[in-house]
Every structure is written in C-alpha cells, then in structure tokens.
Amino acid sequence: MLNDTRVFEANSQGGGAFGDLPEWDLSDLYASEDAAELQADLTWLKQSCIDFSNDYEGKLAQLNADEMLKAVERYEAIDIIAGRIMSFAGLRYYQLTTDPERAKFMSDMQDKLTEHTTKLVFYGLEFNRLDEEALSKLLSQNTALARYKPVFDRMRAMKPYQLSDEMEKFLHDQSVVGATAWNRLFDETIASLVFTIDGEDLPLEAATNKLSEQDRDTREAAAREIARVLRENTSLFARVHNTLAKDKEIEDRWRKMPTPQTGRHLSNHVEAKVVEALRNAVVAAYPKLSHRYYALKAKWLGLETMQIWDRNAPLPIEDDKLVDWTAAQEMVLSAYAEFSPEMAEIAKQFFTKSWIDAAVKPGKAPGAFAHPTVTTVHPYVMLNYLGKPDDVMTLAHELGHGVHQVLAAQQGELLSSTPLTLAETASVFGEMLTFRKLLAAAKTPQERKVLLAGKVESMINTVVRQIAFYDFECKLHAARAEGELTPDQINAIWMSVQGESLGPVFEFMDGYETFWSYIPHFVHSPFYVYAYAFGDGLVNALYAVYEEGDTEFQAKYFDMLRAGGSKHHTELLAPFGLDASDPKFWDKGLSMISAMIDELEAMED
C-alpha cells in the first residue's frame, strides 16, 4: 500500500519571497478534508477490501489466468484510492506540520487505511506460495496478466523472508504505533525547532541556509546555533534512532533478512554486490574528489583549515545576487527544452497548474521532494525556495522527478513506481541539463569557475556525502545490534565517517558531532541515501553517452522514463551500452567529477 513515496532531494537548502511563489492546489486530489468524494472513497475502500478478501482469500491457487488478471486489477484499483487518500492527507500535513488538525487528519486516515487494508495482507503471501510452474503457465495464457510480471517478480523476491499470514497481519496493523509514530515524532520535533541567528528566529530550513551565506561570521553563528539547538534535543533524537534501529532489527530477525540493508536492496531491485561496488568505488575516490576539492576551496577562501561552516560557503568571487522565481522557471524550462521540447512541455504544467509549493513558511516541512500521488492524478513538487543558485538546481532536480513520474504513470499504479536507484536518474539528469546550459552561457573564466565549483560541490554532496551517510547508517545499525547506543556513541560514529569523507583540511567544531540528528532519511527511509550516489553515477555515464552524439539518445531516454518500474536496471541501461553491475561503470561517473576538479586546478596555474 502507498504510505510515503516522496522522493527527497539529497541536499536541499531551500525558500522566501522571490516574486510570486506558487502554492499547491490540492483539489485535484480532494476539495477538502470533509469533501463528499473523500467520504465516498473511504466507504468504497472499506467495502472493496472486504469484498476482495471474501472473493480471493484461500482461493488464489484455483484461479485461471483471466480470473487472476481480474484480481490484480481489483487490487490495483484499491491501491489507487488508498494512495489518493494518503497523498492528500500527507501533502496537507507537509504544508503545515505544526497544525494539530492536519496532523490528526493524517493520523486518522492512516489508521483507517491500515485497518481496511489489513484484509489484503493475505494476497501477497498467498501469491508467493503459488507454484512457479503454475504461475508461468498463467502468464503464458494471458498477455495482459504477463505485463505484471515485474510486479510479481518483486513480490516473490520477498518470498524467503515472509512470515505467517497472522504475523504479517499483526505487523501491518501494529505499524501505525511503531515506526510511523516515531517518524511523526521526529517530523514534529524538527518542525518545532527554533534557531535564533543574528536576532532572528528561524526554522531549520532557513537556519541551514545561513551556512551558505557570503559572510563568514553569519555562517559561524548559524553553525553554532544549529549545534546548540540540536544538542538540547540530542537525547530525544537518540531515542528515535535507537528505537527505529531496534524495531528494524526485530523485524529483520523474524524475517531472517541476512543484513539490515537487504530490505532496501530488495525494494530497490538492486543486488547487494552492485551497491557494494558503488560504495567501494566512492570511498576509494574520497582523496581525489572531496579531499582534493576542499583543499582547493580552502585556498580560494584564504584558509589554512576549513571549519564546518565553510563547507557550503560561496566562493569570494561569487555573485550573491538572488534568482527570482520567474528567472528560475525560465532557466530550467529552457534547459529542458533544448534537450527535448516534450520534456519542457510536461515540466511547464507544474508551474501553470499549481503543482508546486515553493515558499518557506513557518511549520512547513523542510527540504524538497516530488510526490507522485497516484497515476490517475499527477505529481506535486515541494520546495523551500530561497533564490540561491542551489535552489534553482533543486527546482531542476525535483521537476526531473515530476517529469519522470508523469511519463511512468502510463504504466498504471503497480508498474509505474520506480525503485529509488532509478528514480534519481531523471532528477539528476535535469540538474545536469540546467548546469550545462548555464556553463555554456558563462561569459568569463571567473563565471565558469564559479559554475564548475558549484557543480563539483553539488556532486560531492550527492555522491561523497551520501555514501558517508550510508556508511554512518551501516555502522549505526551494526552497533545498535550489540545494544542501546548513547548519544555520545552515535556522535562518535558520525564523526568517524565525516572525518574520512571530508578530508584532512577540515577541523570540526565542538557540537558538529550532533549534526546526524536532523537528517530525515535516516528516520524515514533507512539506507535510502545510496540511491543518490547511484543516480549521480548513472547520470554521469548516461550524459557521457549523450555527449558522444547518439542520435537516438532522446528517444531511448524517454523510453527509459516511460518504463517506470517495469524493467530491471540491466534491461533499462542496455540500449545505452551501460551495465551498472560492472565495477568499472562507477569509475566512469566518478572520473567526470575528477575531470571537473582537474579543470578547476588548471585555472589556478
């Protein structure tokens, strides 16, 4: 069932009043929380789940191919209505997480849906008990049913790890007071934090944005204030992480999952060895990527050692003028149009139809995401737009997701959903198109240098930083398996990966050890973060193919996006002559970043 299929931005620093910033119009989902359509859908959903259970529980093995197709289509229809309701409740909540009414509405909807859909738990379990030969026979008898084979393959990949029907129903029922409740506690705590910087009270999003201000004293004040507030709340955040890691360990143990990462790899439809090859390639490249770049940046900033508040500092030669919303829109749409007019046309709808919520507001969820909602409606994009060049890239990134989600919707609800590893492809590609357009338009070497440095920095944040995050999670879950972790122990794990990834030029201020505590991915989606590095590496390799002048590239690229979750990564990449399971594949993507750092170093001579 659709729970939370937001696709997050890896390093968004987001939002403010830069022209007329758009707000969502959620009426394409429902007119309001008491809309008659919503009540009707809840009633329909409840009855449909009962009917589905009555018609199919204990009977799947007896169905012929046509009957099996009917069952799949009925399940898909239920999935759409459940997804529509939760999308509406979730998006309203993200607009104002501090509103108790919105929080209650989301929680009540989650409770109702969980209660109704518990009756469907049997379906996946019973389906997985079908004999392989019998299933193959059914698929060969009905082409419409055979279209769903990728969905069945993913379901059956879970077969070795499924529990008894009764246990599965219990876990499904109990989830609302388990991980979901701790997620909500985290979200509401983060949204309620207040950071006082230069006499101004700010939410987290606006506070972290100060870390990329031109003025060094402002950056330092922001870093120290963030550290102070996080420190005050560390015991609560440590409790959240301890509980969620233990919750995961218990379920993994019962399911006999070999590692804490297995569940994520299965849902990403990617093999552990592919992720391992990616992780090892990135860690081996730390010295020639992040260490080398930050040493160069220290020189530009005139510093012997970098402090943590210098990591995202703009260059001294950087123009700190802000980009208004209209200019940002024009920049991204024209970059998309040069690659493909169709891509720009799809993206344009997000602006004209109120599918974007862009302003920073008190109580609004931090960060940026694209939410696909359901295939019968359309995606929504959330930003916290503050007019920085980074925010323009975030817009390009999230619109890439949006375009991907619109195109993949043609597959229908069950086949449209793209695993995270491939979901980042269109977003990072959208960023790359926007960057290349800006780079081509650079009028002076200085402008080119600023753009290159910005892109390298963004790639380091997407690749190096996210793999360091992945290592942090791996170490955290391994340590938690040995017993409860104190805040100091979690802090120590964080500092070990930060030191390794950022390199010797950094000195870490007292208090930086708590900065793990505000990163939502660790809480919402364990081991999600390697998907960013996967996506970046993949796009760099794809972009190299595009630059080599493949005349059919656009057509192949659109086919890849339209495929949604209907193909495995090996099948999707084959038309481009790429293979992610080859360890050398990742070096190809990393060498693009390295080449940009080479160019920056050459500019010093």
Which residues are covered by each model-predicted region?
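Short pre-active-site segment immediately N-terminal to the catalytic Zn-binding motif
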Residues: D320-W325, T375-A396
